Amino acid sequence: MEIKEKKKLEVTVDKRHIVSIGERLYAESVELLRELVNNAYDADATEVRVEVSPAEVTVSDNGAGMDFAGLKQYFIIGSDEKVIHSRSPRFGRVRIGQFGIGKFASLAAASRFELLTRHKDFAARVVFDKKAWEEAKDEWHLPCEILNSDPQRGDGTAVILSELSKAFLVEDVERKLMETVPLKAPDFAVYVNGRRLYPRSLVGRRIPLLEGTKYGPVNGEIVITPKSAADFKDLGIEVKVRGATVKKDLFGMETWGKAVARVKGEINADFLPITSDRSSFIVD
């Protein structure tokens, strides 16, 4: 068939889908706080403070912060910045973020997303208002206010979620963060309403694990806890990628009966490909 004429078609995206990325990405609203805390870890923060109230949730850190170029990079959907630069500059941490969409998860539970950041002599505030964003159909920019910088305050970033559409319970936030952020990492502390979170400590017989595979190393520890410590509400072994728990797995122990409640521990396998919501692994 002969070509009569050549034309080009423009590929467009409805702005509403930017919001729906966050609304559909996570099953639990508390999971979005995991993303914000892990962003702080990637930014070389040594301290992250999460403040939860009925009116708003704030996640602030003392990490590197962002300059204007960093802010522009932050709001690129699907950015591979953390894949290209997979280690943080100060501590050499293996960065957890991979997909560049986690920040939009905040819109699943809040209509207003305010970001304040400081980096050296630069400071700025960006506001993402869901209603204003959807109403301005042809406007793809976010208001960014350049602020007077106070060097004495140091670098860092704060995210304030307000006009909440979902409630955050402090105990749920603590539980989720204790399960899914790298609390064992050196020089990294996380606080929720002023209370520091610590990684879970297990008592029992410890079995170290180290296995080489063609994809990369697998390491960790299995703990056989006493019968008195058996926990049927928290079954499975944590599988971690880049220091953050992705899921818990029984690894075929479903038929073990009551004994399965005594087997705990964690396995680290940084080479495993994970889904965009970090809840499972990609299986081909």
Model-derived segments and their meaning:
Residues 63, 161-167, 271-273:
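A generic structural motif
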